[in-house]
């Protein structure tokens, strides 16, 4: 069967169309132009009309260039040699290191059989009190970080990559600014975490098509490591850039647009990636934490809106902090009852008092008279925000719980907290006597 063709029917954006037979959806091809060659993937079949998206872009490609079909879908090497390496969205080295061509695996396969999944039961410690104490990240969970442009969401992901108690970090960047890419790279090296990290990166200067492959490559590699018994944390940023790349391709393909121009299968495409999160019985796990930026801080935007129906909660990053109101880990109750007996009490009591303090902050701003209780709440609010909510705080869960008791004791009497007597007697800080 003929696998090489030398006539391109149409070039539109990053998509080319050829007439070919015996071609499969998702199959790879090499487009050989005059001075270069680019990888392309079949994205549409209409009888003998085959549409391919060119990863390197179509600049310099003419209608007489040669297209050679490879007979397989996209593949990536899988071995421990991936650790500490940086690759682009096609799986090619970006760090100047050698190419890896052994033990190739296909990317983008189906999600694991639900019957093989086990109930989430283990906590992933991050060293961030707003996660560990108040909205615990659970092994095999899928959670987005909802934020807006300008917030330090990549810095938050970086801190989690450096501090999370997992075996392996797979970091996927889509549409990253070059400065952000260098920050990730340099910080992981200085923090000593690059040796347990695999970095797949697509920058804003790269072809938009490569943005689509980053999540699939990251998750396919993660799945193989999880089957080998590794606890893998996949960090993806930014899923809105991923969706925008889908939107651009669908417009080029003249597909009927849906909400705000996004393709009609946006939900399915997002769910397909998030459903890779899993805890294998007798093996490892995949936990997925992503950044989803909200244009105009609009949570009804199609990307965060669809994401919210797929994931098991969300973190809201506002004002450089993880907001306790709106942030939610729906699986936290699976683990926070087995950490320390005061975990849930501290979590509930501190958030309740912080919510009350918001009224006092508003009263003060409007010039109302402040009661002694208001003054206590204001003091508590300041301490809670500086010692618990600040992203620079890095302490173990047990220290964070002890810190919670110290903050409560600094601002309130035991009766004012509403905490049960037995826990007060066990954990309330004892006043030092000289």
From Swiss-Prot:
Pfam families attached to this UniProt entry: ATP-synt_ab, ATP-synt_ab_N, ATP-synt_VA_C
One GO term (biological process): proton motive force-driven plasma membrane ATP synthesis
A GO MF term: proton-transporting ATP synthase activity, rotational mechanism
Domain of life: Bacteria
Keywords, alphabetical: ATP synthesis, Hydrogen ion transport, Ion transport, Transport
Alphabetical list of Gene3D superfamilies matching this protein: 3.40.50.12240
This protein's record includes keyword Transport: yes
PANTHER family: V-TYPE PROTON ATPASE SUBUNIT B
Job of this protein: Produces ATP from ADP in the presence of a proton gradient across the membrane. The V-type beta chain is a regulatory subunit.
Protein family (similarity comment): Belongs to the ATPase alpha/beta chains family.
Protein name (Swiss-Prot/TrEMBL): V-type ATP synthase beta chain
Upper lineage: Bacteria, Pseudomonadati, Spirochaetota, Spirochaetia, Spirochaetales
């Amino acid at each position: 069967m003929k696998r090489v063709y030398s006539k391109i029917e149409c070039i539109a954006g990053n998509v080319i169309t050829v007439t070919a037979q015996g071609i499969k959806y998702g199959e790879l091809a090499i487009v050989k132009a005059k001075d270069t060659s680019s990888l392309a993937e079949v994205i549409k079949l209409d009888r003998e009309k085959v549409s391919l998206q060119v990863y390197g872009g179509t600049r310099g490609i003419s209608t007489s260039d040669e297209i050679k079909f490879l007979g397989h879908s996209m593949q990536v090497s899988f071995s421990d040699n991936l650790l500490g390496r940086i690759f682009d969205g096609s799986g090619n080295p970006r760090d100047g290191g050698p190419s890896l061509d052994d033990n190739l695996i296909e990317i983008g396969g189906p999600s694991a059989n639900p019957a093989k999944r086990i109930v989430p039961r283990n906590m992933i410690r991050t060293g961030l009190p707003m996660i560990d104490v108040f909205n615990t990240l659970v092994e095999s969970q899928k959670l987005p970080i909802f934020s807006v442009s300008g917030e330090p969401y990549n810095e938050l992901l970086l801190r989690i990559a450096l501090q999370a108690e997992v075996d392996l970090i797979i970091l996927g960047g889509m549409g990253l600014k070059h400065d952000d890419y260098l920050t990730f790279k340099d910080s992981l090296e200085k923090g000593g975490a690059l040796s347990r990290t695999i970095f797949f990166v697509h920058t804003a200067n790269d072809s938009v098509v490569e943005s689509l492959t980053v999540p699939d490559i990251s998750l396919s590699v993660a799945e193989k490591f999880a089957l080998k018994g590794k606890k893998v944390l996949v960090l993806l940023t930014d899923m809105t850039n991923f969706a925008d790349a889908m939107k651009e391709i669908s417009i080029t393909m003249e597909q009927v647009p849906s909400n705000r121009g996004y393709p009609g299968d946006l939900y399915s495409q997002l769910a397909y990636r998030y459903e890779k999160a899993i805890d294998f019985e007798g093996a490892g796990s995949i936990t997925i934490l992503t950044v989803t930026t909200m244009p105009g801080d609009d949570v009804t935007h199609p990307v965060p809106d669809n994401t919210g129906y797929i994931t098991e909660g969300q973190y809201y990053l506002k004002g450089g902090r993880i907001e306790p109101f709106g942030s939610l880990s729906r699986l936290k109750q699976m683990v926070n009852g087995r950490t320390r007996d005061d975990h849930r009490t501290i979590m509930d009591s501190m958030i309740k008092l912080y919510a009350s303090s918001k009224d006092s902050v508003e009263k003060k701003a409007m010039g109302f008279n402040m009661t002694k209780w208001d003054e206590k709440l204001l003091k508590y609010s300041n301490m809670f925000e500086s010692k618990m909510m600040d992203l620079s705080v890095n302490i173990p869960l047990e220290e964070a719980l002890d810190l919670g008791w110290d903050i409560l004791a600094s601002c309130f009497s035991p009766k004012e907290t509403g905490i049960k007597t037995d826990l007060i007697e066990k954990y309330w800080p004892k006043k030092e006597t000289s």
